[in-house]
Design a protein with these regions (language model features):
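Cleavable N-terminal signal peptides of Sec/SRP-targeted secreted and luminal proteins
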Residues: 1-15
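Patatin-like phospholipase
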Residues: 12-57, 67-264
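Catalytic nucleophile serine of serine hydrolases
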Residues: 60
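Catalytic nucleophile loop
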Residues: 63
Length: 264
């Protein structure tokens, strides 16, 4: 897999101050540190105003990166990227999960997830507690009860950002559902591995025309599905190929829907 920095420009040539700029972090999971490297490249190589994003979006573990960007004000890109780089350079010091007392088998049978993710909750409280978002955000998660995809940003206060990120990063199967805001949550990657349409709607609510919205997407899957000869595949390679195809289309689906839905 390679890191793709895919920029969708829903604009003609207008004054820069008239743009609503969106930064969307894909789900990523263990590859989210690469998103930070790509963001650093954007910051170092683009006009400073072009990376002063108005709306920040994140799905699954991309929601953590989104939250860390959002707690820094526009214009503080240097401090923001330094903090993010520092976090992921020391990722070996981060404990995101631990085994249940009787291991993954206990998780599968009685805990709702293979691993216990309470260490991740503790890390989020340490890193984000008391730090509020300074920009408009979207953080996607799925309500376990009804299956709705919900933007947790609507529920966030300064004291609740870490809880929202914890809910948005409750990776289905691996971790149990997270109970926050009176509901149970899974991460949103099963529906939108990359969230684009929601942030565009945020810009629209802020009074921007579609032609004045710019979306930068950081995703950790390829934008090209590799071909392979499957003539002699047995069951396991066929299943792996199916999963590869499924992940590819789910990853680019949100972007394609945005492009087709907002041709301006």
């Amino acid at each position: 897999w390679i890191l793709i920095v895919f920029t969708v420009i829903l604009a003609c040539v207008f004054a820069k101050s008239d743009k609503c700029r969106i930064l969307s972090f894909g789900s990523g999971v263990e590859k989210v540190p690469y998103q930070v490297g790509a963001l650093k490249a954007l910051i170092e190589n683009m006009d400073p105003e072009d990376v002063q994003y108005d709306v920040i979006s994140g799905v699954s573990f991309g929601a953590f990166n989104a939250a860390m960007v959002s707690v820094h004000k526009k214009g503080d890109e240097k401090a923001m990227i330094e903090e993010l780089e520092g976090i992921w350079k020391k990722s070996d010091k981060i404990t995101a999960y631990q085994n249940w007392w009787f291991g993954p088998a206990q998780g599968a049978i009685s805990k709702g997830g293979l691993y216990d993710n309470t260490p991740w909750e503790a890390y989020l409280k340490k890193t984000l507690k008391g730090r509020g978002a300074t920009r408009v955000m979207t953080l996607g998660a799925v309500d376990v009860a009804n299956g709705d995809y919900v933007d947790l940003a609507d529920l966030i206060t300064t004291e609740k950002l870490e809880q929202a990120v914890y809910a948005a990063t409750a990776l289905n199967v691996f971790f149990p559902p997270v109970t926050e805001f009176g509901r149970d949550w899974f991460d949103g990657s099963g529906i939108w591995p990359v969230e684009v349409i929601g942030p565009i709607a945020r810009c629209e609510k802020m009074g921007y025309n579609y032609t004045d919205i710019v979306v930068d997407v950081l995703m950790t899957t390829s934008d090209v599905l590799p071909e392979r000869n499957s003539t002699n595949d047995s069951t396991i390679p066929s299943v792996l190929r199916y999963l590869e195809i499924s992940e590819f289309y789910s990853g680019v689906n949100g972007i394609k829907r945005a492009v087709y839905g907002f041709p301006e």
